[in-house]
Amino acid sequence: FLNSKVLREVQNIRYQLFRVLHRNGIRATESRDEDAIGKSIAAGLIENLLEYNSRHAYQRIKDGSWGFYIHPSSVTFGEDPQFIVAAEIVSTNKTYARVNQQVKREWLKEIAPQFISEAPRSIYYDEEADKVIQEVSLYLKQTRSIVDLEKRQVTGEQAVEVFVEALMENKIDYPL
């Protein structure tokens, strides 16, 4: 059910935000872009970024603490999304995350760079791109969950070594 008091509070906060934007000369637009809205909410609550672990339990990324559960009153209850942010953490017989926003994995690089580390992987010559490439895994520091795999161009001495090796192995068709 919708609580009229909460809806009035939301409306008042919205009005205050529009006033602040106007006062600072920022043009406000109304967006229906769910990803942009979701990212904004998640970025504001990033300290309570939680990752699903098992048996409906979550781990907080910031400090690695365990045993968070989605509150039964939450719209995400029973869904067990991989990542959520919580506006409230309440403790009763369990520790519950309330007022949650689901977070998409692809948002994490943008909204939570402070929680991400890099691990270099293989370096190779990419024939199609005609470049030396290094794969780099991006992962969450506390849980080591992979967030993304980036391919970056390698330059300098290391690129020369890989290129020469590819030439010697006839991986490069070099016209004379």
Language-model features, listed with the residues they occupy:
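Acidic, serine/threonine- and proline-rich low-complexity intrinsically disordered segments
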Residues: 1-67, 80-176
